[in-house]
Swiss-Prot record:
Pathway it works in: Amino-acid biosynthesis; L-arginine biosynthesis; N(2)-acetyl-L-ornithine from L-glutamate: step 3/4
Disulfide cross-links: none
Reaction it catalyzes: N-acetyl-L-glutamate 5-semialdehyde + phosphate + NADP(+) = N-acetyl-L-glutamyl 5-phosphate + NADPH + H(+)
Name recorded for this polypeptide: N-acetyl-gamma-glutamyl-phosphate reductase
Family note: Belongs to the NAGSA dehydrogenase family. Type 2 subfamily.
Amino acid sequence: MSLPIVYIDGDQGTTGLQIHERLRDRTDLRLVTLPDAERKDPARRAEAINASDIAILCLPDAAAREAVGFIRNPAVRVIDASSAHRTEPDWVYGFPEMVDGHAQTIAHARRVTNPGCYPTGAVGLLRPLQQAGLLPRDYPVCIHAVSGYSGGGRAAVDAFESNGAARAQPLQVYGLALAHKHVPEIQLHAGLAHRPLFVPAYGAYRQGIVLTVPIELRLLPAGVTGEALHACLAHHYAGARRVEVTPLADTRAITHLDPQALNGSNDLRLSVFVNAEHGQVLLAAVFDNLGKGASGAAVQNLDLMLGVASAVKAA
């Protein structure tokens, strides 16, 4: 039996390079790359896409849409790491742990859209609570996140690392027009009735995200407690190898969250911090924006689509 052919369109960008690194030594697939002189040639790209079993698109949004338009072979399956198709109804959202049975949906999908880095944390925290009826659909959600500068792509990495840390701003809050491209994705896949207010920032470190969502218990259905929110998340992700929920007792000893704690992994760590006296809760997610927030998630979805036993069991 021949090995499945995987082609990465855009393997010189931040995410593409990471995916290539994760796949290059695999013996259960054939990884196809184009020579440097051909990797931007539309005709050669189209040929490589149509000759592949699974094409992984690591491109800007417009180029990703163009690449999908190249497809003439109906057998070609696609994982799109851009944000071009994340709210499209005919694409499967590539977050295996999001709802029960979703890993199998991904495994059989023709078109999978990889989640954005920030939505990975936000949807991971909010979707189970909304689905369980603990978080009303019309709750006024506010999200704050700090990412390593690699979240800005290869240009941001090159700019920061050529200037050096000594001259870098320690924190850059951006998206001040409150129109970040991830907002519609978060709203849709978290099941929210209204746009969340999202404030992102880049820190002066390469990779890793801390994302937080404050919750006022008085705005939730009567009787919902911080303990109930935690129990919901713990139950939802029980058995998920790539998502862990910090035991509630352990959060009382945590004084800070390190955005780099899970760098190099494909893991997502969720925590619930409770101030029962004042009726306030802080939901928090820590993960690698280049791991579970990008390349790691793409490889996890690829493994599901290829039927890799360990991936199916883990999800």
